Regions:
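Cullin-RING E3 adaptor/co-adaptor recruitment helices
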Residues: 2-36, 40-45, 56-57, 83, ...
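Ankyrin repeat start-site detector
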Residues: 60, 93, 115, 146-148, ...
Length: 462
């Protein structure tokens, strides 16, 4: 596996008008020195010369040429890069990333990081196929990486599949490692980049190649980002389901652990379903003894939780911190309302989760009162609970007003016993403990009664 040259920043596609001086070609120092000599932009350029032979690429500060590269002006690129022109140039530009820098008198300021790129990187990352082809035909070094990444890394990041195909046809190394330790396949991180991944695999990119520091395979990356098509492709190509990264996560752990908005829950479910159906272990623990179920509950993905439980995940295993899956969902319920955390709580309880100690229910109410249905499912799992005046004081007045019917019924539980219907439900659930979900279909109950037995939501307690 080849190693890219050292750098202090990644290749860039930032506008060339930032951080550049002058309108000529000249040597300069960025984070490394690129010695060489060159005449003005429009004139033929001599090859590198000097007593030591090859001294490295020239730095380009010609704004006219840079503009041609960044805008994909093929005619201008052809005019500048004639047969005698130097092609392997280095462009210094500012990235979009800020960093703190220290100046004299102990003052610190935020400045844009200086980054190095090349004409090949610029055209490949922007999808300028004809310009890229012209540079390659003029002899551009396809694996040059002054900024720590090759043009192939840049093309995969930008999901420019045609450019990836062209670079590979000119001998680009599909196993090239960036300075951060990633191969091009790791940079296929958008839904549009699946064709880039397919091209890399067909040209020999290792499907299980691990990054150097995080030790993540491409399947870890795809699973964490919820890329269903990438996961399908990698699994068909023989990706290792149980490969562990530096924190002990398998791809299934990585998918379950990734925070995501409610609208992305379906994509993460599809990813987890593919992994589980391919044989991923549902109780694989990371270094903190977090299982996929713990992590899915932290992210309140009810469909993933149901999938893992249906595949045999142990509902009561503890993490290194002593938390079960139920603890995890109760800790985030108030902040994940769009994810409908009450569905996760109900799923866990129906699969036999050990309930919260009754003496801690007041604390749970304070923390989860923004999700009344979470409280409903939890309270209905007990035959009776001791409700005191403190319960009414624990809920903000605006929430009581917003969910008046539910909270009034909750607070009234301290004044009267639970209904006979509820007590019968608790008795049946207790008798079927450990096999509730297997037994319910055999009971042939009416749908409404079946839902009641499985803690269906009514927004009222009785």
């Amino acid at each position: 596996m080849s190693r890219a040259p050292s750098r202090s920043g990644a290749s860039t596609t930032r506008s060339p008008s930032l951080g550049l001086e002058g309108g000529d070609w000249r040597r300069g120092r960025a984070r490394a020195e690129w010695p060489g000599s060159c005449q003005s932009a429009g004139a033929p350029q001599p090859r590198r010369s000097g007593g030591g032979g090859d001294k490295g690429p020239l730095e380009c500060r010609d704004l006219v040429l840079q503009n041609a590269l960044y805008t994909g002006d093929l005619a201008a690129v052809q005019r500048h890069f004639s047969e005698r022109a130097e092609v392997d140039l280095v462009i210094q530009a500012e990235s979009q990333d800020l960093r703190w820098t220290s100046h004299k008198w102990g003052l610190w300021s935020l400045t844009y990081q200086q980054e190095l790129t090349t004409p090949l990187h610029v055209t490949a990352s922007r999808g300028y196929l004809d310009c890229l082809r012209h540079l390659l035909l003029r002899g551009a070094d396809v694996d040059l990486a002054p900024g720590g990444q090759t043009a192939l890394h840049a093309a995969c990041t930008a999901a420019t599949a045609d450019c990836v195909r062209l670079l590979l046809s000119f001998g680009a190394d599909p196993e090239a490692v960036s300075e951060d330790g990633f191969q091009p396949l790791h940079f296929c991180r958008s839904p549009e980049s699946v064709e880039c991944a397919r091209l890399l695999l067909s040209h020999g990119a290792p499907v299980n190649g691990a990054s150097e520091e995080e030790e993540e395979t491409p399947l870890h990356v795809a699973a964490r980002l919820g890329l269903t098509a990438h996961v399908r492709l990698l699994l068909r190509s023989g990706a290792d389901l149980e490969a562990k990264n530096a924190t002990g996560q398998t791809p299934l752990n990585a998918a379950c652990a990734q925070p995501h908005p409610a609208q992305a829950a379906g994509a993460y479910y599809d990813v987890c379903q593919q992994l589980v159906e391919a044989g991923a272990r549902v109780d694989s623990a990371d270094l903190d003894r977090q299982r996929p179920l713990h992590q899915a509950c932290k992210n309140a993905n009810a469909r993933v939780v149901a999938l893992l439980l249906a595949r045999g995940a142990n509902v009561n295993l503890m993490s290194y911190s002593g938390n079960t899956a139920l603890h995890n969902i109760l800790q985030v319920a108030a902040y994940k309302l769009e994810h409908r955390p009450e569905q996760v709580v109900r799923e866990l309880l129906n699969h036999g989760a050990v309930r919260v100690w009754p003496g801690a229910l007041l604390k749970v109410l304070r923390h989860c009162c923004a999700s009344p249905r979470t409280i409903e499912a939890l309270v209905n799992s007990y035959q009776r609970v001791r409700v005191t005046e403190e319960w009414a004081e624990a809920v903000p007045a605006e929430l009581v007003q917003q969910h008046a019917r539910f909270f009034q019924s909750l607070f009234s539980l301290g004044e009267s016993p639970r209904s006979l219907q509820h007590l019968a439900r608790c008795a049946l659930r207790s008798a079927l403990e450990g096999r509730l979900l297997q037994a319910v279909p055999e009971l042939r109950l009416p749908p409404a009664l079946r839902q009641f037995l499985l803690l269906g939501f009514e927004d009222v307690l009785y």
